[in-house]
Amino acid sequence: MKKILFLAGFALLTSCGSVQNTKKQPFTWEGANLYFLLTDRFQNGDKSNDINFERTEKAAVLRGFEGGDLRGIIQKIDSNYFSDLGINAIWMTPLVEQIHDATDEGTGKTYGFHGYWAKDWTELDPNFGTKAD
């Protein structure tokens, strides 16, 4: 008798399924998990665009372009990097064309790798990618 009750209870428990709520929740900024990324430092997805505008002067340590670009960001999105972290909003540094020459701020030559030394607000800096990216 105990065996029958055990089997009946086991069958009942294993046959019960849970209902999944598949309704997608709307995005709200209040619930956002924001990821800030410095585009040039994030992921180099296209090594062919690493040097543009003859930006060949040796920069001080960590003061030059390192190669991160739109292609690298797209690769990480496609690999679910952000969604695996629970990220649903990305804040990127500006991608507009930066000044072409290096500047010495007292720490050695520095390029506008950070995106905040805009030269042309209407063009993408080719170090970061193209409009096709």
Task: Show the residue positions of the predicted features.
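Sec-dependent signal peptide recognition
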Residues: 2-7
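C-terminal motif of bacterial Sec signal peptides marking the signal peptidase cleavage site
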Residues: 14-15
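Short, linear, compositionally biased motifs with a strong N-terminal bias
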Residues: 10-11
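N-terminal structural segment of carbohydrate-active enzymes
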Residues: 19-133
